[in-house]
Regions:
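A short hydrophobic beta-strand element
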Residues: 99-108
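Short, cysteine-centered beta-strand-loop-beta hairpins and adjacent loop/turn segments enriched
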Residues: 81-82, 110-116
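Short, low-complexity N-terminal intrinsically disordered segments enriched in polar/charged residues
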Residues: 9, 14-48
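Hydrophobic/aromatic beta-strand elements that line small-molecule binding cavities or substrate pockets
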Residues: 74, 89-95, 108-110, 120-126
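Short beta-strand edge/turn micro-motifs at domain boundaries
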Residues: 118-140
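Positively charged n-region of N-terminal signal peptides that target proteins for export
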Residues: 1-4
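A solvent-exposed, acidic/Ser-Thr-rich amphipathic alpha-helical stretch
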Residues: 42-97
């Protein structure tokens, strides 16, 4: 019985370490995104998104498919650093769905001289070629 318990505890601790490593990678990606945004660097901000025509972004104007179209929308909506402001994310829930997928819920806030903005988001991450990437974003 002790051997079975030891084996189970070993597997559980391995899974917990893996999940922590995955969560750390996702948190780092989001930190990198906010740092890029706060520098006024939308292109670097977009490195967290899957560079693919199947990327899905849902916002107040509806659904946008594709990395390039999403980048264009960001550039159009935030044409300069005063419009971009300073971005902060508050993560409310991180849930590992499988070894390949993570679901994140959180809040975003833009501190701006022209008026602050804030809202909520859900992100679907997929591990692609060993890297966590945002494949779907619903921000409001």
């Amino acid at each position: 019985m002790r051997k079975i318990l030891l084996v189970l505890l070993t597997f559980l601790s391995i899974d917990a370490r893996t999940q922590s490593k995955d969560e750390q990678a996702i948190r780092q990606l989001l930190n990198n995104q906010s740092a890029a945004w706060n520098r006024g660097d939308i292109e670097s901000f977009m490195k967290g998104y899957w560079e693919n025509d199947s990327l899905m972004f849902i916002g107040k104007s509806g659904i946008t498919y594709g990395w390039n179209k999403t980048l264009d929308n960001y550039k159009r909506g935030y044409p300069d650093t005063s419009a971009m402001g300073q971005l902060t994310f508050t993560l409310l829930n991180l849930k590992k769905l499988s070894a390949e997928y993570f679901h994140i819920a959180g809040k975003w806030h833009l501190q701006r001289s022209i008026g602050n903005l804030e809202g909520y988001f859900t992100l679907l991450f997929r591990k692609i070629n060993g890297q966590w990437m945002i494949i779907a974003d619903h921000s409001s």
